[in-house]
Amino acid sequence: MSEITISRPYAKAVFEFAIEHNTVASWQSMLLYASKLNSNPYIAKLLSSTVITNTKIADIFIAVCGNKLDNYGRNFIRIMAYNRRLLLLPDILKIFLQLCKKNSSTIEVEVITVSALTNNQIAQITQAMRQRLSQKVKLNCIIDLSIIAGMIIRIGDIVIDSSMLGRLERLGTHLST
């Protein structure tokens, strides 16, 4: 099985835990330190040893990390050592960073209407776009009287046109063909 495939559930679990406990930055630094420690040839030899018990490997690794790990970080290292997965820490860090990037990315959605939207309408549109795009959404509301009624939603190249002007233009195109 691929190291990335094995690493993904660990990275996802750590990421979800970090989000839930609002400790993403500290987990990022713990994983970064532990991953750098893996690049040490002596540590790498220790981690791949079949003679030393998993518990002893975890104890040594945690001792070397010192105060760089909190209680949750130490528990994570123990779980990784028990399952003989400490060599996967660089891959786990890589996936964790990808999840952080994806989570922090916010997509801008432009909403064009004839009149100002109410707070309730803004909340409904934001929620619908968040569900559809599976990302955080930032709404930019624009007032344009030329659309007559309805709204136009722009998400990058995608345009959802439910304006009266758009409908009239489509009707005109349909009638002229």
Curated annotation (Swiss-Prot):
Ranges in coiled-coil conformation: none
Keyword annotations of the record: ATP synthesis, Cell membrane, CF(1), Hydrogen ion transport, Ion transport, Membrane, Transport
One GO cellular component, as annotated: plasma membrane
Subcellular location: Cell membrane
Membrane topology: Peripheral membrane protein
Primary localization: membrane
A GO term, aspect molecular function: proton-transporting ATP synthase activity, rotational mechanism
Family: Belongs to the ATPase delta chain family.
Functional description taken from the UniProt entry: F(1)F(0) ATP synthase produces ATP from ADP in the presence of a proton or sodium gradient. F-type ATPases consist of two structural domains, F(1) containing the extramembraneous catalytic core and F(0) containing the membrane proton channel, linked together by a central stalk and a peripheral stalk. During catalysis, ATP synthesis in the catalytic domain of F(1) is coupled via a rotary mechanism of the central stalk subunits to proton translocation.
Subunit field text: F-type ATPases have 2 components, F(1) - the catalytic core - and F(0) - the membrane proton channel. F(1) has five subunits: alpha(3), beta(3), gamma(1), delta(1), epsilon(1). F(0) has three main subunits: a(1), b(2) and c(10-14). The alpha and beta chains form an alternating ring which encloses part of the gamma chain. F(1) is attached to F(0) by a central stalk formed by the gamma and epsilon chains, while a peripheral stalk is formed by the delta and b chains.
Cited HAMAP family: ATP_synth_delta_bact
The name this protein goes by in its record: ATP synthase subunit delta
The organism of origin for this protein: Baumannia cicadellinicola subsp. Homalodisca coagulata
Gene: atpH
